[in-house]
A protein has these predicted regions:
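Extended, highly charged segments
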Residues: 1-311
């Protein structure tokens, strides 16, 4: 498994994980927090079916929210783990909130289901700006994974005791099934750039992985489009635009309906929409299989690094 193939968790895969987790752990009772390394936090929840563990990571190239198998008990003594343990003690996880096309998840905690939230754990999946923060009932930061000082960001400094400031709003357009084909095409061809850049610059929620899926996804009805992310928009034929828009609409329908299935591909990446589910899942949930995907890739990366250091 090549370390270079690790796929970043994008908006689409985050939505898939949240759909899966809501069915499993909402509501559930918080029990345990531990920090196995400097870039992730593991949380244990008691459900009607037993314990479920989540991993929240703010690692720049592998920021993620996934389910994991029961982990080794390690890292409960870190400052962040102790702050989260104290802040969430005797509370229930009552909601997993994610707004629009933002890669920000709000885990809401209350004394019991049906009561107002009194603590919020925020996970921001934003590349090198990723972070995790615990907020009190006044939305003040009581614990933070990565302090952001004034000299690091004049726009959005983040420290314990500060009011929580959400990330700046996304500047591009939110994709919509209601947008007419002609307008969609016109926006993407307004500037003579490659297709990948046109999609990312014009619409929210677009990742390199999604771009590849939109243009090369195996379909039951059509051969894969002979396009790449580097294809100039002015060289795309009318028929290709129609096929691409069909894929675009399929993707948006999956987001709207919350229908996702996980397929791991031979190149080391994965997809969560518009493809048959793997037959090798052994009944494991989508969020758990993604947790294993990231664990395996990151373990492989560590082994490769260690072997190179020994040479």
């Amino acid at each position: 498994m090549a370390n270079s193939t690790l796929q970043v968790m994008d908006l689409t895969s985050l939505r898939a994980v949240l759909v899966d987790l809501r069915a499993q752990i909402i509501p559930s009772r918080f029990e345990k927090a531990q920090q196995p390394n400097q870039q992730s936090l593991q949380l244990g929840f008691r459900t009607l079916k037993g314990m479920a563990w989540l991993e929240l990571s703010w690692q720049a190239d592998a920021a993620r929210l996934v389910q994991i198998p029961p982990p080794s008990r390690i890292g409960s003594g870190s400052t962040l783990a102790q702050q989260v343990q104290h802040g969430l003690r005797q509370l229930a996880l009552v909601e997993l909130e994610q707004r629009d096309f933002e890669r920000v998840v709000l885990l809401h905690f209350a004394p019991r289901p049906g009561e107002p939230s009194v603590r919020t754990l925020v996970l921001e999946l934003m590349g090198r700006h990723s972070n995790a923060l615990l907020l009190d009932d006044q939305k003040r930061i009581t614990a933070i994974a990565r302090q952001v000082r004034q000299h690091q960001s004049r726009v959005r400094p983040l420290s314990s005791g500060d009011p929580y400031i959400p990330p700046p709003s996304l500047q591009s357009l939110p994709p919509s099934c209601e947008e007419p084909f002609a307008q969609w095409k016109r926006r993407l061809t307004l500037v003579p750039v490659d297709l990948g850049k046109a999609l990312r610059d014009t619409y929210q929620g677009i990742s390199p992985a999604l771009t590849k899926q939109l243009i090369s996804f195996p379909s039951r009805d059509e051969a894969p489009l002979p396009l790449s992310a580097s294809t100039p928009v002015e060289e795309i034929s009318d028929n290709q635009w129609l096929l691409l828009h069909g894929r675009w609409t399929q993707w948006l329908n999956h987001l709207r309906c919350g229908e996702f299935i996980l397929h791991l591909d031979e190149a080391g990446g994965y997809r969560v929409w518009n493809d048959p589910a793997d037959l090798t899942s052994n009944g494991e949930s989508l969020s758990l299989r993604l947790g294993l995907y990231y664990r395996n890739h990151l373990n492989q990366r560590q082994l490769l690094k260690a072997s190179l250091e020994l040479q």
